[in-house]
Amino acid sequence: MTTIVDKARNDMAVFEEMESAVRSYSRGWPVVFEKAKGYKLWDKNGNEYIDFFAGAGALNYGHNPSEMQKVMIDYIQNDGVIHSLDMATAPRKKFLESFNEIILKPRNMDYKVMFPGPTGTNTVESALKIARKVTGRDTVIGFTNAFHGMTIGSLSVTGNSFKRNGAGIPLNHAISMPFDQYVDEQDSIAYIERFLEDSGSGVALPAAFILETVQGEGGINAARLEWVKKIEEICRKWDILLIIDDVQAGCGRTGTFFSFEEAGINPDIVCLSKSIGGVGLPMAITLIKPEFDQWGPGEHNGTFRGNNLAFLAATEALNNWKTDAFSQNIKKMSSLFQERMKRIVEKFPELNADLRGRGLMLGIGVHVDGLAGEICAEAFSRGLILETSGAKDEVVKFLPPLIIDEDGIEKGMDILEESIQAALEK
């Protein structure tokens, strides 16, 4: 039987011959994609795929939202400024005004908005730099299985050894502490506090903690809200800055705009990227409490921190948050997802599986070596795009666009069931 993958193999030759060996997603999904809309993609042969990947979280509002397309096309046709570094432009002005009125003010948040560059690692690097400058300390505490980006500072607070080793140099001035429930039900809070209290621990008072409330690349590990609150309490007790990395978990992914809202905490610095750009265009922002916004002009900069098309799409995306309807629908779709996940795990006890995540950032931990990857490969051959996550790629990760509907969930999960069955029969 000729599969989707077989038909596309010849189309992949140029990528295999000319592109660096570092390429990743094109290996697992070896087709040439040509069109995308909503929660679906199509390859050049017309094969349709349900997207449970959403650009690794950059497409929370789906592929090519019509309202975002329109504002960008109109702007280009009227010769709007595309590239502007940090010069003042109309799209930048409108984004700042809308973000303040729609996101910050209703949540009683007071932050300066920094545009550090176009990517998630840019916002993380800026957060680490300003935390060290403000406190005069150099150490930052990260957490086991964390992922914060691929540049040196971000790698230093990342847990994954494969990614860390790619730096090629020692990654200093960072310490890893156990994430919530890293060792069964043991209290990692007491462990962390003991390190800070004990002058013999070898741990210097850090400038900051950097935390993902839900670890995406690390395995869809969702910290309990009470644990997140205790981390903030530690920071306040010891005068340590709290950085929340919401690059993947933010912009509605967990059901609220910020992933930490339900914990009721007030971070000093917040990192946003991926879906902050609305339509998948590169954009990142760093939110900094005003008292910590101690940069000198140009002290942190970047050529592509003024993406006006992204500002336009981002502003349009914020309209989804004017009422709580969008948030409530995310929670409804999350419940449907989790119901199907539970039934699947019960149907296939051979997976030795556990369920993970919050909102529409979900996963099935598969505790059989290599099986999660085989399931994802089978799913792709049947028209469902999924990836794995976790230190050993042991988690089947669900990151659908937030605009997915019940039909998309049911069809996607039907494919997943077929894929699990096929993988188990190999």
UniProtKB/Swiss-Prot annotation:
UniProt key word Signal: no
GO molecular function: diaminobutyrate-2-oxoglutarate transaminase activity; diaminobutyrate-pyruvate transaminase activity; pyridoxal phosphate binding
CDD domains, per the entry: OAT_like
Keyword annotations from UniProtKB, A to Z: Aminotransferase, Pyridoxal phosphate, Transferase
Pfam hit, one: Aminotran_3
N6-(pyridoxal phosphate)lysine PTM positions: K274
Record bears the keyword Cytoplasm: no
Listed cofactors: pyridoxal 5'-phosphate
UniProt pathway annotation: Amine and polyamine biosynthesis; ectoine biosynthesis; L-ectoine from L-aspartate 4-semialdehyde: step 1/3
Family the UniProt entry places it in: Belongs to the class-III pyridoxal-phosphate-dependent aminotransferase family.
Protein name: Diaminobutyrate--2-oxoglutarate transaminase
